[in-house]
Amino acid sequence: MLVLLQSQPSVPDCGYGDRMALDSNCLFCKIIEGEIPADIVFRNENVVAFRDITPQAPTHVLIVPTVHVENAAALAQMSPVITAALFSAAGEIAKTEGLDGYRSVFNTGASVGQSVFHAHLHLLGGRSFTWPPG
């Protein structure tokens, strides 16, 4: 099911992190453009979501903005509208996947596990999780 979310037509660079339409060297930008195959579960003008290739839960989907921005902090400063669109997409995907609950995670920086420097929200569900996360 595709859901169109309100978009922000022109988003200025806030000067925090790298931001451009797409980055030809970025793995996620290549997935957005269809240059690299992925199991895409959701797409609209602001967001593309696809299954993680090394899932950490029965449902593990990566939700990425369709503009290249390095991390969650930069995305939030650049566009609260697109940031909200990622969370709205997470809710729609969870509903489609039949999840009664889910965890959403942004890793911001290499020291906490960010390995692709294109902001992305992890949607994890289908099993129990502990707190604090390990």
Model-derived features with residue positions:
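HIT superfamily nucleotide-processing domains
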Residues: 4-6, 10-134
